[in-house]
Amino acid sequence: MRTEVRVHGSDLSDELRTIVHHETARLAQALRRRINTVKVELYEVPGANPTGHLARCQVDVLFDDGSSVVQVDEEDDFQHSVTEAFVKILCKRRQYESPRHN
């Protein structure tokens, strides 16, 4: 599994890099599907809210079977944005994989 991280408008701190790798490992374990690549794009959006900026995280997960999941989250800081994007992917996948009740 490959992990790619790109930051636009800010620097990638060691703490943020650690969070991305932790969340990626957690995702791989929880999904129990073979993941080919996880791409994490981080954008700082200046002036987007009263605090002066907004952190946007886009996570693209490409599985070995060719299917993919894309999730975007916006928060006040990158750490929360990254964590929330990965949590939303886990919630979507569980909902998608659970049997439907009629």
What do the PLM-derived regions correspond to, one by one?
Residues 1-102:
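N-terminal, polar/charged subdomain of small-to-medium soluble alpha/beta proteins
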